[in-house]
Amino acid sequence: MSEKVCEVKNLTYIYPKSDKGVKNISLYVNKGSIVGLLGESGCGKSTLAKCISGQLKPGEGEIVCKKIGYIFQDNYASLNPAKKVGWLLKETIKYGNPEKFFEYEKRIKNILEEVELDESVLTHYPNELSGGQRQRIGIAMALLSNPNILIADEPVSALDVTVQKQVIKLIKKLNERKNLAILFISHDIKVVREICNYIYILKDGELVEEGESETLFTNPSSEYTKNLLDSSYLE
């Protein structure tokens, strides 16, 4: 039986003074799997991700997740522009493992190798890096906590097609090498089909269908999913 590294039961979060949010969501992610959360923009994907990662507190439901690493859509917004990359990585290590702070040089070298970056990036500020390099730094920072699961919130949507493919390839490698579970959130159908082995479909804050990737793509059961998959990219 597969080990669950993250499970959500009957989760509901509604934004204050609004009817927007997510309602009665239940899902799970097994160790070593890449699970997709697919839906149109504004359907609640990022809200759900923020609830799972602790950025938002749900009004109802239960979340049981082991150690989480979070990859943002645009890591330029999450990286301190006034600090060089080397400092950012050191502080991430210090925050997550203060007792091992003295090992930071070795840890940083290893993590840069994992995300396929040269050590020269350490002396640069985030705005001096390309979008692909910043996203790799974001992935490196997420990995520094030794997570059991990565939540990847639209991790390639801000990148051009060539760089998208490179980052997707890297995420696949990390999944295979580390047996790392990944919750991959996207509105790009082609990307989700390429990388995910199980998919949840979200519409207006509610789950409408779930299933193994190829089964869902070849034989969807809901009318909404059928219409959704007729397009190759959701605006």
Place the predicted regions along the sequence by residue.
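The feature captures the beta-strand-to-loop junction immediately N-terminal to the Walker
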Residues: L38-E40
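Helix-to-loop junction immediately C-terminal to a conserved catalytic motif
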Residues: S53
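Conserved ABC ATPase "signature" region
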Residues: F102-S120, L229
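Conserved ABC ATPase signature
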Residues: Y125-L129, Q133
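A short, proline-enriched helix->beta-strand linker immediately N-terminal to the Walker B motif
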Residues: L144-N148
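A short, surface-exposed alpha-helical micro-motif characterized by mixed small hydrophobic
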Residues: V192-E194
